[in-house]
Amino acid sequence: MTQSKTNLPRRRLLTQTLGLSVIAATAGRSAFAQDKPTIKIGFVDGWADSVATTNLAANIIKEKLGYPVELVPLAAGIMWQGVARGDIDCTLSAWLPVTHEAYLATYKDKVQILGANYPGAKIGLIVPEYVKPTSLDNLNASKADFDNRIVGIDAGAGVMKKTEEAIKTYGLEMRLQPSSGPAMAAELDRAIRAKKSIAVTGWIPHWMFAKYKLRFLADPKNVYGAEEHVDSVVNPGLKAKAPAVYAFLSKLSWKPEEIGAVMLSVENGAKPAAAADKWMADNPARVQGWLS
């Protein structure tokens, strides 16, 4: 059907008006963001907790505080270095006091620790519930069941260094196999499906504990240290650069079930930013509490 010629000017005017409105709204948002500096957040891609917390914070900083945000995936050591040098503004992925103790010793005079965004963290060797060993000091007796290996993550990571120390301290006749966070999780999944023995370097918080029945091997010699916390660490210049962001990060701290919901959503296929947005929508009072 052909359009009535008398309707064309009206439709053209409506289209032009809507177009101008969209342009004006977009320009307004762009101007809002351009008035403020970009906040660069370093994180460790492949660490489920790092991805979850970083995306939540980024969404809040963008949507509630109006700052543009750039997420920068880095290895842990480079991440700390970047905050110290000011190449990035902050990280929400500092495991203290044990896992990242070497980085803190190196950069403590050039960074500022705002406090824990997740208390109750822990690292160590993790096994499925069905395996026989219960402790690092009896792991050697079953080493053949584990193919004489421990599946690790990125070489140089804090938990990897502690595992190398554990191998020496407990006299473990097993090799530490570096890989990555996702590769380690994939190996764990395959082993559990086949009900094979496997030991992996791991930590809480992690979605693996929600998906599988796992436990830490006891560490009677305390190589891995006691309970840890995941801290927000910033470049000292952030307070002057973005005081609202600094204030928000100083208050940000969430609970195991909260971060667990976002991590599981991502593991089940959601985009990290979308999972964080959903959590924000479901928990407006918690978000407002960090901003007030």
Regions found by a protein language model. Give the residues of each.
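N-terminal secretory signal peptides
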Residues: M1-A27, F32
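Short helix-initiation/N-cap motifs at beta->coil->alpha
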Residues: W47-A48, E70-G82, L176-E187
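Ligand-binding cleft/hinge of the Venus flytrap
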Residues: A57-G66, A141-L176
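A ligand-binding cleft/hinge motif common to bilobed small-molecule-binding domains
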Residues: L92-Y107, R190-R215
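A conserved helix-loop-strand patch within extracytoplasmic ligand-binding domains
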Residues: D109-G156
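A bilobed periplasmic-binding-protein/Venus flytrap-type ligand-binding module shared by bacterial periplasmic
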Residues: K122-K132, E228-A242
